[in-house]
Amino acid sequence: MGSKIFLLLGLSIAFALLISSEVAARDLSETTTEGASLDGGHHGGGGGGHYSGGGGHGGSHHGGGGHGGCHHYCHGSCCSAAEAKALEAAQVKPQN
């Protein structure tokens, strides 16, 4: 009898964690899309994981997964095409 109670309690906790993680993921994705649409300079989500260089954590190069990945990077973060062009123009060219 006691083992059935522990089994039901464990399943209930696992189910509650599953639901709360789904809700948290949905809230995070809504927050991310709202922030990207308000900024206007970014090209959607997908920033983050950089090429790991062999070992360690995975992730694609520049983290631009499926649709709407970042196309321009300024100091390691996503930026608009105009910002990338301005940054490139502002960088000092070495004189050889």
From Swiss-Prot:
Residues 43-66 have a biased composition (Gly residues). Induction: By the removal of auxins. Disulfide bonds: none annotated. InterPro entries: GRP. Residues 1-25 form the signal peptide. May be connected with the initiation of embryogenesis or with the metabolic changes produced by the removal of auxins. Belongs to the GRP family. This is Glycine-rich protein DC7.1. It comes from Daucus carota.
